Amino acid sequence: GRPNPVNTKPTPYPRL
């Protein structure tokens, strides 16, 4: 997965 500065708790990837 990619590092997400917004949502790193519920999901390892950005939920756009």
From Swiss-Prot:
Keyword Glycoprotein listed: yes
Subcellular locations according to the entry: Secreted
Signal peptide location: none
Induction: By bacterial infection.
Glycosylation sites: T11
InterPro entries listed in its UniProt record: Formaecin
Modification after translation, per record: O-linked glycan consists of a Gal-GalNAc disaccharide, O-glycosylation is essential for full biological activity.
Function description: Antibacterial peptide. Has activity against E.coli but none against other Gram-negative bacteria and Gram-positive bacteria.
Protein's recorded name: Formaecin-2
Naturally occurring in which organism (per UniProt): Myrmecia gulosa (Red bulldog ant)
